[in-house]
Amino acid sequence: MSQEKQVFSIDLAGRQLTVETGQLAKQANGAVLVRYGDTAVLSTATASKEAKNVDFFPLTVNYEERLYAVGKIPGGFIKREGRPSEKAILASRLIDRPIRPLFADGFRNEVQVVSIVMSVDQDCSSEMAAMLGSSLALSISDIPFEGPIAGATVGRINGEFVINPTVEQQEQSDIHLVVAGTKDAINMVEAGADQVPEETMLEAIMFGHDEIKRLIAFQEEIVQAVGKEKSEVKLYEVDADLNQAVREMAEKDMHSAIQVHEKHAREDAINEVKKRVIEHYEAQEADADTLGQVNEILYKIVKEEVRRLITVEKIRPDGRKGDEIRPLASEVGILSRTHGSGLFTRGQTQALSICTLGALGDVQILDGLGVEESKRFMHHYNFPSFSVGETRPMRGPGRREIGHGALGERALEPVIPSEKDFPYTVRLVSEVLESNGSTSQASICGSTLAMMDAGVPLKAPVAGIAMGLVKSGEHYTILTDIQGMEDHLGDMDFKVAGTAHGVTALQMDIKIDGLSREILEEALQQAKVGRMHILDHMLSVIAEPRTELSAYAPKIITMTINPDKIRDVIGPSGKQINKIIEETGVKIDIEQDGTVFISSINQEMNDKAKKIIEDIVREVQVGEIYEGKVKRVEKFGAFVELFSGKDGLVHISELALERVGKVEDVVKIGDVITVKVIEIDKQGRVNLSRKVLLKEEQEKEAAKEENKQEQQ
């Protein structure tokens, strides 16, 4: 095919989307430059010529952010991009999930898809441009990809659905949905919503699919014009005779092993069957390739038998019915010194979530390509190896942990009270202590319990549940509360979180070509029933958020000052505010509108800091009377401190009724005297008088004496 530059365009949500091929990255198997508005993303696809000796499909998807895309130079000592941001990792997962199911089973060549964000227009999503670019790079390449796919962002404003909403529209939208799929079916959903009914979410998904069909037709035109012929790749297959022999040896025993209800006992039973078969072939001195094939066949036997039991015999590995939820157990307040804690257990899945409250100055500062500069609500998810009874090096969070943490954050954020109603930064950490499926949803339930225990006034409690699907031809079974084996061997992982009023988050990944509207609708309704059951259980443990915060949580008071006085509170180079912090031990956060947040564990220190700030911003008015301390004495008068940071001068002529020859004859440093403000000059200097008050007192006494004499 021609390597000349070619340009293709389509209108997308009122903005032009352009695809350029044949000019950049021509040594990649496939490469396109996608321009959407002023957003520009270069997407490339490359593949190894030979299959890798692994038992999985080695696909890597990278979404690379470059700060030059928004005209920024990276901060810090090393002026170049470091590890991927959380947003970049989530975008990589977003692109990976819809394209992964569209490679043939048995394809083992290594494939790498890279999207580099080169220019960002905030109203034109770089993630959606990268998703379309990744699909196109694969589709026009010689890599055997069974796409194309496309994605669309859907919002809803005043009841009307909007495709790829602008930043302004997103702020008004109660749905933030990313949907991807082929022209025939949906195969990926990622959504956050403000307690939206299931029926509305389904309509939003189908609305997005209509746009996907149009974008796929556009891609097909490009593939027709510039696409390469797909290379023929030998798919991995096991030897037919070996396959039959292993099945005859293992199928009957595996059928029994799979139906052991307890997870570890079931794994032991399955491993015992595998061990017996492997030892049989090792005794025959089988080579590594043969043993690898034996393992592959044994895996397929387990997968096929689990799926057959579910779809044909309607039996789940642990004996539950299709819509049955595992036993639930919850507890709150199990960690004394934390601000709030919640333990949620569902079968052999257990999550301990901890809520920490901080001042608004504890927000997470964001330095990426987005418009957001900070984040006051965070949810972090940890998955230690002991949760599945394994040993593994303890490293930082991987893509999975970041993805699960973000899903929980998205599910809970709609019910977090506003900064005005609850001026705290909220951080949640979910520690997965046991894992047998649905840990991300357990972390959502545990986090809700932890926040209620901490006294966070949630708009409504949130629960989450993971749904599964096993599909064989036209027959399918939808599973509620899937466990690890059902997730691993099934066709769908569909996570739904929400309140009693509606959905707050959705995430769907599937391993087959796509799902019909009917299956999606049934899964959503079945998930709602399960979610309500879990919510009832959680509310039986703690019915509403505690009315008082933990004794160890910071106390926050709010005050408002004149914005013109902010600089007085801060002082030159922060001298004044640092002095207050040092003196009281509080944290102080000041908004541009003059709102001041003072926080510390000690309420007395909060009040002290508030008094100091009130004194700093306080306006002195002519005619006001103060009781102040003499701070300095000069020949011409005495300087009196009216309140912290504000002095005035009592001229020697205003000290007493009689003539004063020497200031020290009337007052000395440290004396407390009552004075009246008689003038504020053009330079803001305050002139005080003691004499005026003495005269007023003298006149009152004289009037009293006169009245007394008249009465006699």
Swiss-Prot record:
Residues 623-691 form the S1 motif domain. GO terms for biological process: mRNA catabolic process; RNA processing. Residues 554-613 form the KH domain. It is an enzyme of class 2 (transferase). Its cofactor is Mg(2+). Its EC number is 2.7.7.8. GO terms for molecular function: 3'-5'-RNA exonuclease activity; magnesium ion binding; polyribonucleotide nucleotidyltransferase activity; RNA binding. Mg(2+) binds at D487, D493. SUPFAM superfamilies: Eukaryotic type KH-domain (KH-domain type I), Nucleic acid-binding proteins, Ribonuclease PH domain 2-like, Ribosomal protein S5 domain 2-like. PANTHER family: POLYRIBONUCLEOTIDE NUCLEOTIDYLTRANSFERASE, POLYRIBONUCLEOTIDE NUCLEOTIDYLTRANSFERASE 1, MITOCHONDRIAL. Involved in mRNA degradation. Catalyzes the phosphorolysis of single-stranded polyribonucleotides processively in the 3'- to 5'-direction. This is Polyribonucleotide nucleotidyltransferase.
